[in-house]
């Protein structure tokens, strides 16, 4: 589950609900631990009692952004934090687009929930297509810049997904005994603001949200 660092309240809430329910339904949520969609998806997966994986663009001992050290520890306890870079490697900008190929490679399906036309999540989407992975995008407001990237993906053939069931239904037969939609009936969605706060992530319903320490 990937997307922009900036986000609208619509994008944040749908990201949280979908990642939460995907985790309950048996999916492992993979993302990059960045601000915005990445951290929301990881926190939601943990709240859903599921597994989550974070792929870093830095050394394993250099968590970036630093505000997500607490979240990184939570991810490690519920899945894994991994990187191809040696310890001590700083988070240079060029590392993140390269890192995105690993996120796509580890995934059976990639969901982009919020993206401008310049979002790095579109790089992950291109890797997913090149690797033959399922590609989903969340439809949004066509005049919102944070939805222009997802609109582009939909025009280029990505599947529309507005809830976790859209993805789980498509993969239930491929993962028998793992994907289970009935679990969604037993577990209501956790409260987003409270869950994000427990991971050290501030949410104020803005398009750009300063993260707490």
Question: Where does each model-flagged region fall?
Answer:
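Glycine-biased, small-residue-rich flexible motifs in mid-sequence functional cores and linkers
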Residues: 2-213
């Amino acid at each position: 589950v990937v997307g922009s660092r900036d986000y609208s309240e619509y994008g944040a809430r749908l990201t949280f609900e979908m990642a939460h329910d995907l985790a309950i339904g048996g999916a492992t949520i993979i993302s990059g631990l960045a601000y915005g969609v990445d951290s929301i998806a990881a926190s939601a997966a943990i709240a859903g009692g599921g597994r989550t994986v974070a792929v870093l663009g830095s050394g394993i001992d250099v968590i970036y952004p630093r505000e997500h050290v607490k979240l990184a520890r939570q991810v490690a306890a519920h899945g894994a934090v991994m990187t191809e870079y040696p310890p001590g490697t700083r988070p240079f900008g060029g590392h993140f687009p390269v890192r995105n190929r690993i996120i796509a490679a580890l995934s059976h399906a990639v969901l982009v929930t919020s993206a401008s036309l310049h979002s790095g999540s579109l790089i992950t989407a291109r890797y997913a297509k090149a690797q033959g992975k399922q590609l989903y995008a969340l439809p949004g407001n066509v005049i919102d810049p944070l939805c222009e990237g997802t609109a582009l993906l939909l025009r280029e053939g990505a599947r529309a997904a507005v809830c976790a069931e859209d993805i789980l239904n498509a993969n239930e037969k491929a993962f028998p005994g793992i994907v289970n939609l009935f679990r969604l009936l037993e577990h209501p969605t956790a409260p987003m603001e409270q869950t994000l706060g427990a991971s050290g992530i501030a949410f104020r319903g803005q398009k750009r949200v300063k993260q707490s320490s």
